[in-house]
């Protein structure tokens, strides 16, 4: 914040005896007086300068008042006062007066008293306006201090902050987080149960697969055995057919031999000799035939019994293996159906898991965004508090500066009043005397106004200009 102050110096020249006095730093005042003597006196060009400035030291204006008085005679005297003052609060006033008298004779301007009254009235009006402005600024400053104090108490005091709305939002968010945590816990538990069930079914599937492979290996072995038995049966059937053909061939040869022997016996001559009786060939052949037929029948029965036994055994084994194969096929079908159902359930659980993971990620992202927004809001509020504290410090400095200005202005006003009281007394007691036979003595006083402009930044004078 930059403030400007103007200082005015008025010096008096001419006459007999002169004095100058410099006032406080925010304004200036000068006093000059002169007494002239002679046959006649003339007092003219008496000026009183005034300086006042607007708020903050800007818009500085210098006002001057001129009073001219003349008197003729053997002697004369005069006095002049000038005051000027200005402050950053915005106010200023000026006053100038002059009086003279002589013995030699002359005339006085009749308007002096009226002009002095008008000047005093103007001075009083300006002083009243300035005081009103000071009171209004004090009141506004008090209101601002009260507002700042209330704002800081409401915003910066930990006990005075109202977090009820935030508490409700935080409670809702905590409830939502707890619900999501419970849901996630249930989902994790369901996933673990599904994993355990999947592992159990996988173990069962591996066991059933091993059993199936074992049953398929047994079935393959039984099929090979069945093929071997089928080949053995075919071989036996071929042997039976060969034996039947051989039996038929033997029967045919036997019949041919019998026929040949009968034909030979019919053409022979019976010669009886005294010898031992021969055996009956027919009976022998019949016995041989019976013996061979018995052996053949026995072999056939044994073959039939063996074939029947083997057939029954193979049939039983094939039936048992067929039933086992059918049961195994049924079990394999059931296991396949169960495996397909488990795979479908596993896919659904995996899809559910992915969906829940996506929901969890979305929830975390949404809560992260909300948390970021809340943190940004907290940061913004903290920055506002810092700015408010800076504004409070700045306004406190401005208030202190205005208070100092007010104090100095009050001191200047008191000094002005004291000088005005002293000036009024000197006016009432001043006079001039002299003698002469008609000569004229004139005295002229010139008041020079000097204005000093200073640029003040943070209480330090940056530049100074004298006009």
Swiss-Prot record:
Belongs to the intermediate filament family. Coiled coil: none annotated. Residues 152-169 are annotated as: Linker 1. There are two types of cytoskeletal and microfibrillar keratin: I (acidic; 40-55 kDa) and II (neutral to basic; 56-70 kDa). Transmembrane segments: none annotated. The record marks 365 as: Stutter. Residues 262-284 are annotated as: Linker 12. Residues 424-467 are annotated as: Tail. Heterotetramer of two type I and two type II keratins. Keywords: Coiled coil, Intermediate filament, Keratin. Residues 1-115 are annotated as: Head. Residues 170-261 are annotated as: Coil 1B. Residues 285-423 are annotated as: Coil 2. This is Keratin, type I cytoskeletal 50 kDa. Residues 116-151 are annotated as: Coil 1A. InterPro entries: IF_rod_dom, Keratin_I. GO terms for cellular component: intermediate filament. Residues 116-427 form the IF rod domain. The lineage of its organism: Eukaryota, Metazoa, Chordata, Craniata, Vertebrata. It comes from Carassius auratus.
